């Protein structure tokens, strides 16, 4: 059983209830809905090293989320749903295929945006 599979099994069984950091980095093709079981406690979510190209529209259900890493995935644009996560301070989408960063994807409280090794030609004027 892979580490990610074991972590998902532990998440499904409730063994991870109350954790503040979750690392799921091992070839996931879609966002595991089980993550929402941690909605009231999760602060750091690492989904790097997967095959993701989108995040769920209801990501803001993770009300305490401060940091999200989605490096080395298949994103072509920074997901606009990130702006609905009001506690989000750090976003890392290194080594994807991001070409576009829409102003609507930038959360007002965002302090760090990591887009190294992408294909972004311009950033929104709202980023200073």
What are these regions (language model features)?
Residues 1-117, 121-125:
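The feature captures the LRR N-terminal capping module
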């Amino acid at each position: 059983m892979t580490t990610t599979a074991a972590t998902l099994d532990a998440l499904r069984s409730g063994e991870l209830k109350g954790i503040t950091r979750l690392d799921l980095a091992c070839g996931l093709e879609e966002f595991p809905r089980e993550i929402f079981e941690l909605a009231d406690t999760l602060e750091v979510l690492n989904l790097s090293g997967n095959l993701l190209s989108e995040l769920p529209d209801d990501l803001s259900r993770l009300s305490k989320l401060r940091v999200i890493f989605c490096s080395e995935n298949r994103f072509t644009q920074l997901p606009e749903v990130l702006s609905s996560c009001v506690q989000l301070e750090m976003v890392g989408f290194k080594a994807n295929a991001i070409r576009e960063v829409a102003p609507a994807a930038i959360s007002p409280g965002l302090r760090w945006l990591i887009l190294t090794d992408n294909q972004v030609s311009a950033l929104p004027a709202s980023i200073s």
